[in-house]
């Protein structure tokens, strides 16, 4: 599969529609990523967004005609606002690749995960994140969250090095 990486700098909403559609697909299937469109679009525009596209022959790489595989929207301080990978492409290393890119660019990487989202928590722990605290009523719907942080610099370096191979 031909995979193209694109980066959308803060202040742009390039590819926001494709990211929204992927987020909504995941929300409908898994009851996570429940943010409203306005909140999502605003956060997307304030973040640097790393996107992975599966190329469609004859299309411009990373264009809206390509299929969005996944994306990570990250604040300047390394806080991951959104991480989403198309369910049909999970287990293929795309989430790790996105997070390795984030780890390469930030000294500290943190995020929240819905406490009931066991798949996300398992993923984050597998790549070296540690649960730092549990927060009740974190989400608008009253759902609890875990605050996670990528372990010390050694783990960040190892994750980045692992993904460069």
Give residue ranges: language-model regions:
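Acetyl-CoA-dependent GNAT
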Residues: 6-90, 96-101, 159-165
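C-terminal "cap" of GNAT-fold acetyltransferases
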Residues: 114-118, 137-165
């Amino acid at each position: 599969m031909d995979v193209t990486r694109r980066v959308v700098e803060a202040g742009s909403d390039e590819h926001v529609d494709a990211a929204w559609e992927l987020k909504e697909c995941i929300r409908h299937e898994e009851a996570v990523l429940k943010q409203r469109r306005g909140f999502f679009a605003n956060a997307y525009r304030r973040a640097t967004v790393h996107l992975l596209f599966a190329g469609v022959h004859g299309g411009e790489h990373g264009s809206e005609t390509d299929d969005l595989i996944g994306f990570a929207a990250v604040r300047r301080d390394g806080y991951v606002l959104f991480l989403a990978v198309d369910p049909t492409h999970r287990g293929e290393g795309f989430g790790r690749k996105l997070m390795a890119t984030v780890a390469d660019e930030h000294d500290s990487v943190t995020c929240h995960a819905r406490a009931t989202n066991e798949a996300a928590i398992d993923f984050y722990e597998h790549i070296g994140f540690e649960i730092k605290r549990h927060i009740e009523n974190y989400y608008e719907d009253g759902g609890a969250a875990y605050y996670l942080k990528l372990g010390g610099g050694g783990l960040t370096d190892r994750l980045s090095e692992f993904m460069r191979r």
